[in-house]
């Protein structure tokens, strides 16, 4: 590492520590030429691949802006949005890939947002999942109700989910998509 003071091409690492809850490494360095010390931060880059094929750095701020629109008029604090964005980044980074699809970021938002506020979840899901009809909303609401009643994850559109019935038997709930998308298939 080049010394920022004397431009000597080499430096020695004196100390290394985790920073930003393990997302980065803080290194204290010493220059053998001038003897001055300086700090560097190392962080693995995470890039998001958009539908157009272009890539850009992952941004918690963009996650917050997108989710804030869904939360307008809802009792959701800025701190809650910051924590949600942090959880989304942790989820996306846990994939181990340096580049993730924008769709994966959207999917990572859905779970924490559902826990935070169901109305905001429906608003976000309606845009992210491209709801086209009232039936899409009804299916999403039915999935949320099923989750509340059964305490489990809501079904994914078009994917059957087995829920225990009161009689001990099981019922299969399949969210139905109506309109032009229904003919296209999953």
UniProtKB/Swiss-Prot annotation:
Residues 46-136 form the ATP-cone domain. It comes from the Bacteria. GO terms for biological process: negative regulation of DNA-templated transcription. GO terms for molecular function: ATP binding; DNA binding; zinc ion binding. Binds 1 zinc ion. Residues 149-169 are annotated as: Disordered. Pfam families: ATP-cone, Zn_ribbon_NrdR. InterPro entries: ATP-cone_dom, NrdR-like_N, RNR_NrdR-like. Keywords: ATP-binding, DNA-binding, Metal-binding, Nucleotide-binding, Repressor, Transcription, Transcription regulation, Zinc, Zinc-finger. Its cofactor is Zn(2+). PROSITE patterns: ATP_CONE. NCBIfam families: transcriptional regulator NrdR. This is Transcriptional repressor NrdR. It comes from Parafrankia sp. (strain EAN1pec).
